Each structure stands twice: as C-alpha cells, then as structure tokens.
Amino acid sequence: MAEERKPDEILNAILAGSEDKSIPELLKEMPNEKLIKSFYYMESIPEVTQMRVLQDILKSAQNSEFGKKMGFAELKSVDDFRNKLPISDYSQVEAEIEKLKAGTGDILFDGATASFIATSGSTGIPKLIPESKNGQLVKGLVSQIRAILLLMLAPEVMAAGKKVLAIANPSEYGRTAGGIAIGSASGQAAKDMPTEMLKKMVLPPAMMMAKEVSNEATDYLTIRYALAEKNLVGVVCSNIAHFNILLKKMNAQAAELLADIRTGQISASITIDPSLREKLVSELVADPERAAELETILENKKTLDVAAIWPDFAVVSCWMSASAAKIVADIKKQLPQTVKFLEWGYGASEGKFNIPDKAQDPAGLPALFGYFFEFLPVGATHNQTVLVHELEKGCYYELIITSYSGLYRYNMKDIVYVTEINNQLPRLVFVCKESEKLQVQQLQLRVYEIDGAIQTISDRLNHEIRFYQVLLDQENNKLIFMLEPYSERFDSDSFRVSLEQHLAEINPSYQQLRVAQQLWPAELIVVRDGYRDSLFTRSIMPGKNVNQTKLKTIVSEYPDSSSIVDWAKEGEK
C-alpha cells in the first residue's frame, strides 16, 4: 500500500499546520478511504507526525488559563515542552477540573468543555475526565478508523441481512453542576460508530440509548433481541466476559425467552420503565417459526449452542490483552473454530490510544494523529521519557500522554509492551496498570511477570488455567495463588512445586527471600468451576455492569471456603 499512502494537499496542510483548523477537524472532513490513507501515511512518519500533533495541541490551548501560565505560545520544541512541564497525574489537575465541571471555560484548553467521561471507578469514586471539542473529534476518529479496519478484516459483517450485537454502556449518565454531559468511554464509542455499522445493530436505538435500566433487565433484553435474530454474524464489546455470562443466562432463561420470541412480547417478570416497554414492544413482531426452531435445537442439543442458533456467527471484537486474554481463550472453546477475534482497542476515559489492524492480535498502532505520546521505561529511576520513534521491541513502558482535552504529560499509570517495530513505528499492547505488582522487601513481581510464570508452568504440565488471582499473606509472609483450572484432574501439588521453582529461577530476589526464610513456600488454592464468573457479578460497582468490570489479579482476601476445592501446601498431600 506504499503507493497509496502519499500525502495530498490536505495532508500537506496537516503537516505544515493550518491557521483555522485543527488536525482532528481536517481529518474529520475526509471520506473514509482518504481517512485510512491519511492515517497510514501519518503512521509512516511518526517523528514528524508527533511533532505536528504536539504543536497543534499547544496551539489549541495557548489562550487557556493553563496555557498562558505555562507559556504554550513560546514552546517551540519537544525539549522545550518536556523541560517546562513535569509529568502529572489526576491530583495535579483536579482543581482545574472542578472549575470545568462548574461550566467555566478556557481553563485547560481554549473554549468550553464539550463533555466529561467517567472513569471505571476502581477505587469506588469515579473521576471525571474533561473532553474538549477536539478531544471528542479524536476519539470519534479513532472509533471510525477502528470500525473501518474491522470491516476490512471481517467483510462478512457487511453482508446483506447480517446483524451485529454491540454490548455498550450508556452514552450519558447525567450532567455536572454546570450542565455538562457525563458519559462512558464505551458508550461514546457506540455513538461514534459509522452509520453503516449502526444500521447493522441487532439492538434497537431505544434500548441502546436507554438510561436507568437495571443490569438484570438489560441483560435479558440483550439476549432476547440477539436470540430472535438468526442472522447474527458477530459481537462487539469491550469485555467478552459479559457475552460469556449472557450465553449462560440465555440457557438458564430459555423457556421465558422463547415464549417472548413466539409472542413478540417482553416478559412481565422484567422490570423496565412502562414507556420504554411500550416503545420496544410496539416494534417487536411475533415469530413462532424462530421460537420453534430454537426449541428444536434445545431439545436435540440440550443447550442453545452458538453454532446452531447463529449459523453465520463469524466475528468477535473485544479486549484481548492483559487479564482479558484468558477469558478470550475460554470463550473460544464455546465458539466455532472459524470465528475471527479482533482486538477492541486499548483505551480509557482519558483517550483511545491504539488502532488494531490485524486479526487475532491484541496489539495495535498508536493513534499518532490524536495524542502526543511519551514513554517511561519500566524500572527507570528517572523521569526521562522516550518518544514513539525511540521505542524498543520487547520492552515495557509506562504511558505518558498529552491530549487535546487538557491532559499534559499525564501519566496514565498503564504499562504497555512493544510487540514489534516496523520503520520506527511500534505496535503496542496494554499489559497492566503500574500499580499491579507484589512487593516484599526487595522483591517486586509485576502482573505480567506472574502471568508469564503461570503460563509457562501451564504449558509445561499441560494444565490449562481458566482464571487466576494471587495475594500476599503479609501476616504469614507467603504468596497464595488461586487457580480455576479447566480439568478436574488438575494436579495442584505438582503445579505448586513447579511454579515455586520457576519463580526462584526467574527472580533472584524471590530465591533470596526463600533461602533467608523471609518468605515461606507459596501455596496454591484450587477454586470451583465458575468462580471467575461469580466474581464478575459480585464485583460490579453501583451503576456499572459486567462490560465495565475488570477483575483484579492481585487481591487482598482469601476466597470463601465454599469456593475452595483443594489447597496445596509444602509438605502436605
């Protein structure tokens, strides 16, 4: 495609700088084909693109309160920028964000705040991330490019009559005291879908945009619409665990669902707003033929099997990296082998940072046109960052972003891994939060190191693991690994011994603490089948759902006794 990626007049304007339009505004004007060509061309010259994006971001905020304070108009180089502004986090912009929430403009960027995005609230108190007009455009463009590339990788989605199930969160939760909308990152992504994709959605707009619907009702309605549609070709969501749970609920509630499909109704047992119920039911059609077909499948197979109920099911787009990788591996066992898995894309409330363009690959190209990226090598004892074109393959970095929405040298406290580099352009994958690590004196084990160790032993002993968590019992100075294996024949003693030996081999600090008896032998708890899925329903924060829920890998509590199948300890059989 090199011939197709040459710059044209608009790209020259982007690279030279436009007096009256930002880079996101120029890109938004492009038709899909030109947008994709422009995206790939800008990716091919990462150093030039990133310099232009930084200049454009600073220009769009130079008249703001913060921009004047920091002298954005005088910053002429990357070094000027890095020398002037320290690396920051949410606490350092919280006061400015409070002003933005009240409706005050020209604080962190020029103009008014377009919206706020609520974080997942893992601490119990969601943070609100401001969004400028340009910041909204960037997220919309990333979603647009992701959708276009998804369709290029899975053209069967656009076949006539085929439908897609998109599991998203509400695009708007409420408003701030200043009257500014508060939404979710995945809900906004659903709004940003291209029109041709929205027409493919199996869920009606009235349901996708509905507010204050319980998780139970949302799940039932999602299954009800999906099950009624024989031509479902794929599912798009962030957390594939949600789809996995929906499949289980589908079988548990089969009789009720089939009755609704047969009569064109919504069960009276499902509590929803009467006006929403009336709106949805008015558009439903009784389908006794589909109900009979599903009844036959259920009778013959004793389950509503994906391949049988949706014969054309071919595509899943979801998170595939970090803790989601094992969930993807699990659900693949329930789907036809021909199903393509496409990465949903790495992002957060603060931004959408990469654009996947390969099937079965969790990594993606950095969204160079929308953010200025810096990277802090993991383990560095200094704050000296490297830029996109300076990254090294096989290395781990903390991600530092500068955005059009008022985040400057903002530490995402995310760790990303460089899977490959092609002509200075890296492919990045999210691996864990910086805080996800175990520390005992001089020992430090990050989640990706623990995951690698468990995977190594799993492969060596041919014991596949569906899910795991680990805790540090500080009172007794020992690591406790909690594993949910696939097989009932799992040998917990041999797995524990092999894991203990492997940790000592790969981490000298672990070996030293064990020899000095400052850390006692690791223990392994085998938890019952279905433990992971039960955690999802128990871990949902108020106002959230499974799609927005991530399970912690490092925990502080033992599982309840009813969940424990076996407990392997040194010297015990």
Listing of model-derived features with the role each one plays in the protein:
Residues 67, 127-130, 150-164, 256-260, ...:
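Short secondary-structure capping/junction motifs at helix and strand boundaries
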Residues 122, 149, 249, 253:
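Mid-sequence acidic-hydrophobic segments that form the walls
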Residues 134, 151-152, 156-197:
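Active-site cavity-forming subdomains of large catalytic enzyme subunits
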Residues 2-73, 81, 85, 96, ...:
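Active-site glycine/GP-rich loop and adjacent strand/helix microenvironment
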Residues 116-130, 246:
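Conserved adenylation A10 loop of the ANL superfamily
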Residues 130, 135-140, 341, 347-349:
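Long, hydrophobic, well-ordered secondary-structure blocks that form the structural core
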Residues 101-105, 125-133, 204-207, 228:
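Short acidic, glycine/Ser/Thr-rich loop/turn "cap" segments at secondary-structure junctions
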Residues 52-56, 60-116, 131, 138, ...:
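Active-site diphosphate/adenylate-binding microenvironment
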